[in-house]
Curated annotation (Swiss-Prot):
Residues binding ATP: 10-18, 38, 119
Organism (species): Trichormus variabilis (strain ATCC 29413 / PCC 7937) (Anabaena variabilis)
Superkingdom per UniProt: Bacteria
Pathway(s) served: Amino-acid biosynthesis; L-arginine biosynthesis; L-arginine from L-ornithine and carbamoyl phosphate: step 2/3
This protein's encoding gene: argG
Assembly information from the UniProt record: Homotetramer.
Binding site for L-aspartate: 121, 125-126
Name the UniProt record assigns to this protein: Argininosuccinate synthase
EC number: 6.3.4.5
UniProt keyword list: Amino-acid biosynthesis, Arginine biosynthesis, ATP-binding, Cytoplasm, Ligase, Nucleotide-binding
């Protein structure tokens, strides 16, 4: 008896997920494999991917256009949370995984499958994200991960696929592993595994080299409504179009590259290269607008929430009770985060140069040092006395 009767496989069209189809059937006795490819704005032609799955042995090949949900339900909440894993990575790949898990579970329930499968290895973070998310959404479904068990090298995997007519898309001149969606690109493997190696310019696609960027700065104004980006230069944009336009605008000035040593959930460090122009600038602008519209105590407390939020999303806990609790806090903080942020783009830098809001807590008459100053300077003495009282008492006791 096989490990499952009918399986829905997360499918990308790459060699690993393509090899999973015959492997599940031949080695694990699965009777039927249905593939599901998610259109996350990666730009691939999905019809050839669908056809490749069928040629590889899938009984049915599904394609789901989830771009709008990806931005509205996953990316935008992350912007409200100022989510940057280890203060650098805006979680472009990590945010896609719970959405893919959701549509996998929905497809499994619709087609009567008893298992879900993916092509993740035992070394990465995605296996955790898929397994935990799918289990949270439907604990009754089995999770199959052939690449975690088959023990084949990259070369052996390619050779196995060739026995079933599956060609390898990887060329010797391009050895990198790339994941792409609307939020950006992640690039790893090959020579990049040496952390002292400078990434070659050829790996970048969304961001221009500094030498090729305009010699004049460009100013853009990003409008937010309750923490959600809604306009560019005063023009309302739907979520997908807003991300696409910002990726182009920001990337053309060389902004959006990340080269970092990342602490993976599975306990190892990895060298990761990311391109994420829109997300980086949106988080930077959103955080700046919060500094104008949130009280000091909420702003300071939210920083700790943001770090926890980033960690649990990175670690695959999107559907956890803690994530739901953090969401409730973050949504409450966003009620007054509406306004416009002006950003200067020039030679690889995005600089906030202005911000304004009807909910601004900045009071010019109190902040000024000019003649218009309305701050009661005499009140400071009493405040300082009370504020410093615990320290004064401690000092007196300490000196005996």
């Amino acid at each position: 008896m096989g490990r499952a009767k009918k399986v829905v496989l997360a499918y990308s069209g790459g060699v690993d997920t393509s090899v999973c189809i015959p492997y599940l059937k031949q080695e694990w006795g699965v009777e039927e494999v249905i593939t599901l490819a998610a259109d996350l704005g990666q730009g691939d032609e999905l019809e050839p991917i669908r056809e490749k799955a069928l040629k590889s042995g899938a009984s049915e090949s599904l394609v789901a256009d989830v771009k709008e949900s990806f931005i509205k339900d996953y990316a935008f909440p992350a912007i409200q949370a100022n989510a940057l894993y280890e203060n650098r990575y805006p979680l472009g790949t990590a945010l896609a995984r719970p959405l893919i898990a959701k549509i996998l579970v929905e497809a499994a329930e619709k087609y009567g499958a008893d298992a879900i499968a993916h092509g993740c290895t035992g070394k990465g973070n995605d296996q955790v994200r898929f397994d935990v998310s799918c289990t949270a959404l439907n604990p009754k479904l089995k999770i199959l991960a052939p690449a975690r068990e088959w023990g084949m090298s990259r070369e052996a995997t390619i050779a196995y696929g060739e026995k079933f007519g599956i060609p390898s898309p990887v060329k010797k001149s391009s050895p990198y592993s790339i994941d792409k969606n609307l939020l950006g690109r992640s690039i790893e493997a090959g020579a990049l595994e040496d952390p002292k190696f400078e990434p070659p310019e050829e790996i970048y696609e969304m961001t221009k080299a500094i030498a090729d960027t305009p010699n004049e700065p460009e100013y853009i104004e990003i409008g937010f409504t309750q923490g959600l980006p809604t306009t560019i230069n005063g023009t309302p944009k739907d979520p997908v179009a807003l991300i696409q336009e910002l990726n182009q605008l920001v990337g053309s000035h060389g902004v959006g590259r990340i080269d970092m040593i990342e602490n993976r959930l599975v306990g190892i460090k990895s060298r990761e290269i990311y391109e994420s122009p829109a997300m980086l600038v949106l988080i930077q602008a959103h955080r700046d607008l919060e500094s104008l519209t949130l009280t000091a105590d909420v702003s300071h407390y939210k920083r700790g929430i943001e770090e926890t939020y980033s960690q649990i999303v990175y670690n695959g806990l999107w559907y956890s009770p803690l994530k739901a609790a953090l969401d409730a806090f973050i949504q409450k903080t966003q009620e007054r985060v509406s306004g416009i942020v002006r950003v200067k783009l020039f030679k690889g830098n995005a600089t906030i140069v202005g911000r304004w809001s009807d909910s601004s807590l900045y009071t010019p008459d109190l902040a000024t040092y000019g003649a218009e100053d309305q701050f009661d300077h005499k009140a400071a003495e009493g405040f300082i006395y009370v504020w410093g009282l615990p320290t004064r008492i401690w000092a007196q006791q300490d000196r005996g």
